[in-house]
């Protein structure tokens, strides 16, 4: 299994959590972003910088991801593409996406985007905080314990 990190919006609070697991499990990891992102120093991490542009990092992740790989991303359409390749995806708040739930999350995301575009609602999700990092750590570590 390879771990992929969609680095474009990766929260700083998650970096030490993920780095500890990468080191503990000697987990091959690719951090992909359109700018330099530093998760930490590890011989198990490869940093890949893609061209600027919408979804360039997403396209590279999809190209490289294989069955049973894990992608950390807050991008639900990217998670959907990974699931369709028989990969796994987890978001920054610890939600593990699956074939059973990804379409529901995608539909909700699209609905909320439409509501925001209509002006009926502004803003996005609440700010990321320590409770979110804790939920992520629990789900991430449980996934790794089961799959590594």
UniProtKB/Swiss-Prot annotation:
<dbReference type="InterPro" id="IPR003791">
    <property type="entry name" value="UPF0178"/>
</dbReference>
<dbReference type="Pfam" id="PF02639">
    <property type="entry name" value="DUF188"/>
</dbReference>
<protein>
    <recommendedName>
        <fullName>UPF0178 protein SUN_1096</fullName>
    </recommendedName>
</protein>
<comment type="similarity">
    <text>Belongs to the UPF0178 family.</text>
</comment>
